[in-house]
Amino acid sequence: ERPQGETVKNLIAKIHQELGKLVMADVDSLEAAIEAVEAGADCVGTTLYGYTKATQNQSPPGFDLLSQMVKQLQVPVICEGGISSPEMARKALDLGAHAVVVGTAITGIDLLVKAYQLELSKNL
């Protein structure tokens, strides 16, 4: 349920008309991506893959989803989520991603430091 019962299509139209901005839809499935594009999204990202009830047993990045989206959609597809190495970023681009978002692998240094601390403090 959206605020004031607005549909995604109406929200996207408002963003386009009133703000003159492009809209990226974060999705977890091909079906959601198709719906987003039909509602007017200018691009779609694999951002929610692995983080929703329907995909919680999957681990990002969703390379299979990315490949399907690239083949079936006529808008740019962004690979976002779970990119933890340059090789993974290259694979996403090779599969046809318009762009790749690298987040925690670069900005999450604190998580990496904690993991090292935890492991190295065992049995001391």
State the predicted function of each range.
Residues 14-28, 71-80:
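Short beta-strand/loop segments at the ligand-binding rim of alpha/beta enzyme cores
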Residues 1-16, 30-35, 51-70, 86-90, ...:
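Active-site-adjacent beta->alpha loops and helix N-cap segments on the catalytic face
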Residues 17-20, 42, 67, 71-74, ...:
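Generic secondary-structure signature for well-ordered alpha-helical cores
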Residues 29-42, 75-79, 83-102:
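Catalytic cores of alpha/beta
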Residues 49, 98, 105-106:
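Flexible glycine-rich beta->alpha loop in the catalytic core of nucleotide-sugar glycosyltransferases
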